[in-house]
Amino acid sequence: MRPALSDYQHLASGKVREIYRIDDEHLLFVASDRISAYDYILDSQIPDKGRILTAMSVFFFDHLLRTAGVPNHLAGPPDDERIPADVLGRALVVRRLDMLPVECVARGYLTGSGLIDYEKTGTVCGIALPPGLGEASKFDEPLFTPATKAEIGEHDENISFAKVIELVGAELANQLRDRTLQTYTAGADHALSKGIIIADTKFEFGVDRDGTVVLADEVFTPDSSRYWRADSYQPGVVQNSFDKQFVRNWLTGPESGWDRHGNTPPPALPDDIVAATRERYIEAYERISGLSFDDWIGA
């Protein structure tokens, strides 16, 4: 159920976020406690998840702007007076942008859909890779592996850089690739200094009225990124993670009884999986930011 914010017009619902109109120039992004997996929105919710995602995004928006000069869509602090009290801590005031129709994925390691593509074709998004790679292999340099933006219930599809050029033109395509890799490198370097590997991540960008490519939506959250423990990293095996992969693993494991390739939605998550997911998200935030989640605003 989305929050009823009488002062603002509701514009759109995503898998996790609700978007409201503040005025012609600004939007209110509200992160819910919903969790999605395999293109389904699960019946279960993760307590405080929306606040954790918001706290992580605020930390990284600030870090990336200060250290790498990456512009973002924030238009006010997390306690901005335009944010209603009942969504404080899970909502942000942001600038309206012309959003670009590309999921900008950066990969530092081979896993997930990238591994599936590689095992079938020896490539990821049309990028030829050397033979002999496996689960969690580290790339010499991070890859830009874009995808389409799918509607809720549909699959994002990996696409080639040539397809990105078709969608947005060569100039913007080059900017998206360069900004994606710059942003990933800056964030991954910071995370590694805190004992966390960001194996891959997904960004969204828009263009402001001046034509600047601007980082939007969320950034380096456990929903949009794979977080691995650096001290236990071992190529060739599935890694110990802080992110949504924990939920995916339970859903596809024997305990859930769910057939991912069938036509039925996933089951509700057991209480212990809900609690463990919340703990992993909080640990990721606290390790990355050096801050206590208890001090984050809202409730």
UniProtKB/Swiss-Prot annotation:
Reaction(s) catalysed by this chain's protein: 5-amino-1-(5-phospho-D-ribosyl)imidazole-4-carboxylate + L-aspartate + ATP = (2S)-2-[5-amino-1-(5-phospho-beta-D-ribosyl)imidazole-4-carboxamido]succinate + ADP + phosphate + 2 H(+)
Alphabetically ordered keywords of this record: ATP-binding, Ligase, Nucleotide-binding, Purine biosynthesis
GO biological process, one term: 'de novo' IMP biosynthetic process
Gene Ontology CC: cytoplasm
EC number: 6.3.2.6
Pathway: Purine metabolism; IMP biosynthesis via de novo pathway; 5-amino-1-(5-phospho-D-ribosyl)imidazole-4-carboxamide from 5-amino-1-(5-phospho-D-ribosyl)imidazole-4-carboxylate: step 1/2
Enzyme's top EC category: ligase
MF GO annotations: ATP binding; phosphoribosylaminoimidazolesuccinocarboxamide synthase activity
Highest taxon of the lineage: Bacteria
PROSITE patterns from the UniProt entry: SAICAR_SYNTHETASE_1, SAICAR_SYNTHETASE_2
PANTHER family the record matches: PHOSPHORIBOSYLAMINOIMIDAZOLE-SUCCINOCARBOXAMIDE SYNTHASE
Listed NCBIfam families: PRK13961.1 (NF010568), purC (TIGR00081)
Family affiliation: Belongs to the SAICAR synthetase family.
The protein's name: Phosphoribosylaminoimidazole-succinocarboxamide synthase
Organism listed in the record: Mycolicibacterium smegmatis (strain ATCC 700084 / mc(2)155)
